[in-house]
């Protein structure tokens, strides 16, 4: 089944009511949190929402420092910096927080080569963010997270396939798989490799539309970026960019674009 589902994945460009081009992916690719609970206020102060003005929440992301947000490449392709803003400092999409302007979008030069690989990108804020109790950076991990580890997924993705999007940030603990188990349970080894991290708990728990680009955290460090899944929470693994694998790319890309 998974092999067939992945085969029909396609990228769609949709124009919002505000005539702003927004990149979305069909339901076989973008993700959200299913089976989670409302996150406590301030429990994920590194979590941001990438927003399209006039449209709203598009993807998640993680604040790495006062200027940079880590997200998925597919959240950035087709956009110019002026197309996006970054919401920080709130668990609610309806109130609180601060919307920040973006001045640079960067993603891996081999994004989607091969398909579903190198899905990682960076967003540079126009001005440094002001840190507070509700706005904090997260350290990105240099070490690979082990299999069978309990990790934390957060996001504003749909709470069921074709279901509603939550106003409040959702949180869910999930369990990592080895790449071997991920390929076995996913049904097609061509879509995951050493640059991926997979999670799976049970049917009814996982990522969904709107979670893309968001954080997966282990022992307080960022270990994954939401990439893809079978919508939604149907008992198949969810795929993430493995942050430890892309650690050097993240570090050098930020350093080379600091001015």
Swiss-Prot record:
User: Which class of enzymes does this protein belong to?
Assistant: hydrolase
- The residues of the propeptide are 18-32
Which InterPro entries does the record associate with it? Answer: Peptidase_S1, Peptidase_S1_PA, Peptidase_S1_PA_chymotrypsin, Peptidase_S1A, Trypsin_dom, TRYPSIN_HIS, TRYPSIN_SER
Key words of the record: Digestion, Disulfide bond, Hydrolase, Protease, Secreted, Serine protease, Signal, Zymogen
- For whether the record's keyword set contains Hydrolase, the answer is yes
- The EC number(s) attached to this protein equal 3.4.21.1
GO CC, sorted alphabetically, is: extracellular space
Gene3D superfamilies referenced in this protein's UniProt entry, alphabetically: Trypsin-like serine proteases
Q: Ranges for the Peptidase S1 domain?
A: 33-255
| Organism superkingdom | Eukaryota
A GO molecular function for this record?
serine-type endopeptidase activity
**Tissue specificity statement from the Swiss-Prot or TrEMBL entry:** After blood feeding, expression is induced in the midgut epithelium, followed by secretion into the midgut lumen.
Signal sequence interval, chain numbering: 1-17
Q: Quote the catalytic residue positions.
A: 74, 119, 212
Any GO BP: innate immune response
PANTHER family reported in the protein's UniProt record: FI18310P1-RELATED, POLYSERASE-RELATED
Q: Which family does it belong to?
A: Belongs to the peptidase S1 family.
Name of the protein in question: Chymotrypsin-1
- Biological source species: Anopheles gambiae (African malaria mosquito)
Taxonomy, top ranks, is: Eukaryota, Metazoa, Ecdysozoa, Arthropoda, Hexapoda
The gene name reads CHYM1
């Amino acid at each position: 089944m998974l092999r067939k589902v992945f085969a029909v994945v396609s990228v769609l460009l949709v124009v919002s009511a505000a005539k702003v081009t927004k990149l979305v992916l069909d339901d076989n690719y973008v993700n959200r949190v299913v089976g989670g609970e409302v996150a406590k206020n301030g429990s994920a102060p590194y979590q941001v929402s990438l927003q399209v003005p006039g449209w709203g929440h598009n993807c998640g992301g993680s604040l790495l420092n006062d200027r940079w947000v880590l997200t998925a490449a597919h959240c950035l392709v087709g956009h110019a910096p002026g197309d996006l803003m970054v919401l920080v400092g709130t668990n609610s999409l309806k109130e609180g927080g601060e919307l920040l302007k973006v001045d640079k979008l960067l993603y891996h030069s081999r994004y989607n080569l091969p398909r579903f690989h190198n899905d990682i990108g960076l967003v540079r804020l126009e001005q440094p963010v002001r840190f507070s109790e509700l706005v904090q950076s997260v350290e990105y991990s240099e070490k690979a997270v082990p299999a069978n580890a309990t990790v934390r997924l957060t996001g504003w993705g749909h709470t069921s396939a074709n279901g509603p999007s939550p106003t409040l940030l959702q949180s869910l603990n999930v369990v990592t798989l080895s790449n071997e188990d991920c390929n076995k349970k996913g049904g097609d080894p061509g879509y995951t490799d050493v640059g991926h991290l997979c999670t799976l708990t049970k049917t009814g728990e996982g990522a969904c539309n709107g979670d893309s680009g968001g954080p997966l955290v282990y022992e307080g460090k960022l270990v994954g970026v939401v990439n893809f899944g079978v919508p939604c929470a149907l008992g198949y693994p969810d795929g993430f960019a493995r942050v430890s694998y892309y650690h050097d790319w993240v570090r050098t890309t930020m350093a080379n674009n600091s001015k």
